[in-house]
Amino acid sequence: MMKYTIRNRHTIGIIALVIALCASCSFNSPSIAFPKVQRLYKHTVEEDFVENLAVFAVFQDADGVNDYKELLLQENATGLEWRLHRGNTIFLQESGFSQHEQWVGSNTFAYPRGAFPAGAYTLTLSDLGGNTTSHVFTLQKPPRVTARPFQFTVNRETWQIHVKNSSFCCYFSLVMLSADLQPLRTHHLGKKETETITGSLQELIDFVPDACYIQCFSENQDRSIGFFSAPIPVP
């Protein structure tokens, strides 16, 4: 009787383990929604520009957003790959989203030789069960950037944007940054068609008293290209 009991307990333990493993498996394939791609140009102190590619998409999975494993970006012509694991993925939640959908991606993809070439790219999302879903998109030829499309200045009372190239300057935002240049708050100015835009610096500081830097961000008409000014210390 004792041997039977031990064997029976052992069998029950194996069954419980199998059930636990099955419960942790991912049975549903994920899907991609609302993919967004944008070339980002950062103006450095050395009067130069650095390009990064921002790639985001909504990860949808019936098993929940915690089933997300990684994002893979591939240049189809060369096979070059950029891989994001959970640890270096940016997760963004949006009002109205369920527990089965979440924005995933990054704005720091960098090409090894300057700007990302025009052509086809494949975005692939995978879950913990090894299920994948892909989306192919096409990048247009990168713009020829030789000068800042706008000038951003700050004094103790006001901030000012002076537009130099309107083709790159349709929508504007102001980003308040921490001492280590992490974004604290983004103030969207919306679509602007005037050559000069001015506002109160104090109004921005009132929202984020601990901000140490301020940065301007512009986007073109279809928001496929964005420009960051160099961060300016808050006076």
PLM segments and residue spans:
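Aromatic sugar-binding surface patches on proteins
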Residues: 89-110, 191-202
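Sec-dependent bacterial lipoprotein signal peptides
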Residues: 1-25
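Proline/serine/threonine-rich low-complexity linkers at boundaries of modular beta-sandwich domains
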Residues: 25-37, 133-143
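Low-complexity, Pro/Ser/Thr- and charge-rich linker/hinge segments at domain boundaries
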Residues: 139-162, 233-235
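Solvent-exposed loop/turn segments flanking beta-strands in beta-repeat/beta-sandwich domains
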Residues: 62-77, 82, 164-182
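Contiguous beta-strand segments within globular domains
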Residues: 40-61, 66-68, 151-169
